[in-house]
Structure formats: C-alpha cells, structure tokens
C-alpha cells in the first residue's frame, strides 16, 4: 500500500520547516519528502491549499468518558469525581466502555489525533475499538486500592489480565501501559509493585501527580512530603514514567523530574475548567523536562480536540505570566507532536523520511486560516479540529476528505446516545 500526498504545505523535520512538497508513503513509513515526486502510488491525495502536519499525540486522556460529557460541569475536582463521575462509572459495563471508546476514537480521528495515552478500565475492550478505528493507543488500566491490601492484589491481578489480553492482540498499534491512578488513591505497596512489574515487562507507567492543592495537602499530611518526593523516595520515577498534570510542583519537585527524565503531560483545558491551577511550564522547560500535551477526559474539557488544546496552552501561560513570549507557537506545537512521541518511545511526531506515516492534513482554504503567513501560528492560534480533512495512521487512511473510512459514524453516535441514557 502506497500513498502520495501532492502539493501540500508540509511541516518537515524536527525544526518544523514549512516546505511546498509531496510526501510519499510506502507501507507504514514516510519514504520521501520532496517536490514533484512522480512515482506511482495506490492512492494520490491532492493537498493543494492544505497543510500536511504530523498527527497529534494526546498524552493524557480517558477516551471512553465522552459518555459522561456534560453530565457534571462547573464543580471542584473532588466534588465532580465523588458525587457525579465515580457513581456513574460504577454503572459502566465492559460493553458500555467499548461504546465510549468508539466515540472517543471517532472524535480523535476527526480532529487529527493519531496516537493517545489512555487511562480507564476494561482496557481490553478499548483496545478492540482502537484496532477497529485504526488509531495508535497506549492503554492503561487505572488502578485504585485506597490502601486496602485485598484491593491491592485485586487491582494488580486485573492490570496483568488486561496486559495479557492486549498483548494477545499482537498489534504494533496497541500497547499496554501501567496506570496507578495517583499517589492519593494508591498505596505505597501498589506503587512499588507497579514499578517492579513495569521494569520486568518493559512497559511505560502513567500516573496523575500534583493535580490540585487538595492532593498536595493530603499527601503532605499523610507522608510529610510532596507527591513527587514521595515517588522519588520509593524508587518509582524513571524515564519510562509519564505524569499527568504536574500543576503544583516546587523547585525541588522539578529538579527530581528532570533528573529522572520523567515526562509531564500538560492538560491546560482540564486544569482551567476544574480550576486546579497552572502548571509551571517555563520552569519545567528550563530544567529540561519533556512536556507533552493532553486533553484529559472529555467530561472535564469537554472535548478531545488537540488543536484547541494547543491554543489553550499557549494563551494560559502568557496571561498567567503576563509575558506574551512564553509558550510560543512552535514550543506548543512540539508538545502536541514530537514531545509526545518521545515520551511514548514512538518513531512518529515528525514528518521526515523513515518516520511512521502518522499524518493529519488540514484544510487551509478557510477564511480563518488565510492568508497563510505562518502555518504553525495558524495551527496553534486559528485552527480547530473541524479543519482536519484527512487522517492517516501507520500508512492507512482513517479519514479522507472529511469522511471517516474505518468506523460507521452514525452507528457510533447512536450507540453512545443509548448508553448515555442508561447512565443518567
């Protein structure tokens, strides 16, 4: 299978050079980026007036939570979770989660996301949806034991069961990740065992850390130290760890994260909506910490649009620091592409020969994207997910000219509505 993308504005290489060029894809790799490629291809896409971008990498989400979108808004995090989200999640069956995963996958395909790091439950069912949709999914079962030893054993058993189920799929696009929920919901015993298992099985770890001031207070009262120091003291951290949020980090925390090569997944939309706080982006970047971008779940955002998330990230840090030079467009664009790929150890996030063919083609023949003075600026400040026209993952076209090819869109939406009624 080969694809030739003709006449596009291509965002090329690590430096984000915008060049007028063609892109040739063979199998699942980009093999050539140059002008006037004349080789025959199975599919030819005319990208005149379009931007050919790396696909976006959502480094923290809970994709099935689209089922809960709009059910509880304008509330503090713990009230939102305990009184509204967790009670409804208790009603979720494996099949309901799968329906939610299809809805999330459809939304991501439509907005140019090609890879996502997910945390939820019944992840073997999510994996089935990811395979059908054609996306790349890094899937973690969210483990919570609340200090109960019996529950610790149960959670570890379930994580290993889901790991085995996902590995049996034998797909290069679907990967299991260990996902202890957070230091305030997980015992030290659980965290230590996760660290051991991740090393044994060569898996990544993702965990919510320092999201709210309430969490900081709870952990400090319980252990006499910050969540990051706690994780460092028990030997949990490493360059295979991706922490979500990292809002309330002091200078010591930041140095610890930098020393271990930990990635932080920034979720500006969710952090603003839940009034959690503002991640110290500049301090983290200056310390050399890898920062990716995530939407969080679409019940706390309330969508999975990475183009919108880039704009939120850029604007949040400018106004918070009263400095318009902070979180410039190129820095934020890298967070949504290259940096996410680095965290996932994925040869993607860049359009260049030899890289995986994970691509979003954005239609710039729109009034809000003209004139084309600066492509990266337009993507960060002017574009939105509805401008994405074609999505390619692993050399396969998932959406072409606005038509999703891998999923029955009407069926996905109809099934989601039916499940939502049962959860209300």
Swiss-Prot record:
Pfam families linked: Amidohydro_1
Keywords linked to the UniProt accession: Hydrolase, Metal-binding, Zinc
Record note on cofactor: Binds 1 zinc ion per subunit.
Cross-referenced InterPro entries: Amidohydro-rel (IPR006680), Deaminase_MtaD/DadD (IPR023512), Metal-dep_hydrolase_composite (IPR011059), Metal_Hydrolase (IPR032466), MTA/SAH_deaminase (IPR050287)
Residues that hold Zn(2+) according to the record: 60, 62, 208, 296
Gene3D superfamilies: Metal-dependent hydrolases, Urease, subunit C, domain 1
EC class: hydrolase
Cofactor(s) this protein requires: Zn(2+)
Reactions listed under catalytic activity: S-adenosyl-L-homocysteine + H2O + H(+) = S-inosyl-L-homocysteine + NH4(+); S-methyl-5'-thioadenosine + H2O + H(+) = S-methyl-5'-thioinosine + NH4(+)
SUPFAM superfamilies found in the cross-reference section: Composite domain of metallo-dependent hydrolases, Metallo-dependent hydrolases
Enzyme Commission code: 3.5.4.28, 3.5.4.31
CDD domains linked to this entry: ATZ_TRZ_like (cd01298)
Taxonomy, superkingdom: Archaea
Binding residues for substrate: 89, 181, 211, 296
Family: Belongs to the metallo-dependent hydrolases superfamily. MTA/SAH deaminase family.
Function summary: Catalyzes the deamination of 5-methylthioadenosine and S-adenosyl-L-homocysteine into 5-methylthioinosine and S-inosyl-L-homocysteine, respectively. Is also able to deaminate adenosine.
PANTHER family: AMIDOHYDROLASE-RELATED DOMAIN-CONTAINING PROTEIN, AMINOHYDROLASE SSNA-RELATED
Name of the protein this chain belongs to: 5-methylthioadenosine/S-adenosylhomocysteine deaminase
Organism listed in the record: Thermococcus kodakarensis (strain ATCC BAA-918 / JCM 12380 / KOD1)
